[in-house]
């Protein structure tokens, strides 16, 4: 090998190493949210980068939930703390357990204790998708709520109990009866919009609409539903993200996606 060729390779190697180091430093300096999802191998949801396209790094870890049943929640619940520790080791500055039913199914006190345990295990602030719903409702001073869910009757009832324990009156709760999205398939936007609106319209004394389940794609439906129902809409993924980024010291404020996100 000629000396000029050797110098070229050394320079190139140093450039690659320098770029890698710079990328590592940038990642360390960027506020990072670690998210725990019920399914295995779940990617960072597109809602995250739609709402917050820059200035935040998102990490995802799944716990392998296969069905939305209490028995299945029990099976995977023990995987939450190891997942949180893994995300902390990857540089997360805050942890969010991004499963609504996985975090509300045993009630408000159990959900609170989960956050305590995640923080104790990682040394990081933590929240849950269920907390995102509660904080979203509080942001618009909601007291009486209509609730549309993806779940079967049992899990939907458990959400009703959780919300009541959190200080809200549940005027109506109805679910789509889904136990497994793998078996059922996705819910179309039109189906979800019409179902959610019908739940609210059947509970005229409600002052907010809740749509619960992170697998339901609600982000682009919030504004149409708020116009149709003339009431604030709080839903799992968008408002969990809003609550989660606030743990990073950010406002969470985003225009164009409904009342709560506009408040920041």
Locations of regions flagged by a protein language model:
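Short, flexible loop segments at boundaries between secondary-structure elements
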Residues: 180-181, 233-251
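Hydrophobic alpha-helical
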Residues: 196-225, 235, 240-241
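N-terminal secretory signal peptides and thylakoid transit peptides that target proteins
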Residues: 1-16
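Glycine/small-residue-rich loop that forms an oxyanion/phosphate-binding "nest" at active or ligand-binding sites
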Residues: 103-125
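N-terminal glycine-rich anion-binding loop in soluble enzyme alpha/beta folds
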Residues: 28-82, 154-156, 161-188
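Periplasmic-binding protein-like
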Residues: 36, 93-98, 146-147, 206-213
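Conserved beta-alpha
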Residues: 118-181, 262
């Amino acid at each position: 090998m000629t000396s000029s060729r050797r110098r070229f390779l050394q320079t190139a190697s140093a450039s690659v190493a320098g770029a890698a180091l710079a990328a590592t430093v940038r990642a360390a300096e960027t506020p990072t949210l670690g998210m725990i999802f019920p399914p295995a191998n779940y990617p960072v949801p597109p809602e995250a980068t739609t709402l917050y396209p820059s200035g935040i790094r998102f990490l995802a870890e799944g716990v392998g939930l296969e069905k939305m049943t209490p028995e299945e929640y029990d099976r995977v619940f023990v995987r939450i703390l190891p997942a949180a520790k893994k995300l902390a080791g990857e540089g997360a500055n805050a942890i969010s357990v991004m499963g609504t039913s996985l975090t509300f199914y045993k009630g408000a006190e159990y959900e609170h204790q989960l956050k305590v345990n995640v923080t104790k295990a990682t040394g990081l602030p933590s929240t849950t998708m269920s907390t995102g719903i509660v904080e979203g409702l509080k942001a618009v001073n909601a007291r009486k709520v209509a609730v549309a869910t993806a779940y079967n009757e049992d899990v939907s009832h458990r959400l009703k109990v959780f919300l009541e324990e959190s200080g809200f009156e549940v005027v109506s709760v109805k679910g789509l009866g889904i136990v497994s999205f793998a078996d059922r398939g996705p819910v179309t936007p039109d189906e979800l919009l019409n179902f959610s609106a019908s739940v609210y319209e059947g509970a005229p004394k409600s002052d907010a609409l809740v749509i619960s389940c992170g697998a339901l794609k609600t982000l682009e439906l919030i504004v149409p539903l708020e116009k149709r129902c003339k009431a604030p809409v709080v839903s799992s993924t968008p408002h969990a993200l809003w609550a989660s980024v606030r743990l990073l010291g950010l406002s969470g404020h985003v225009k164009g996606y409904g009342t709560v996100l506009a408040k920041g």
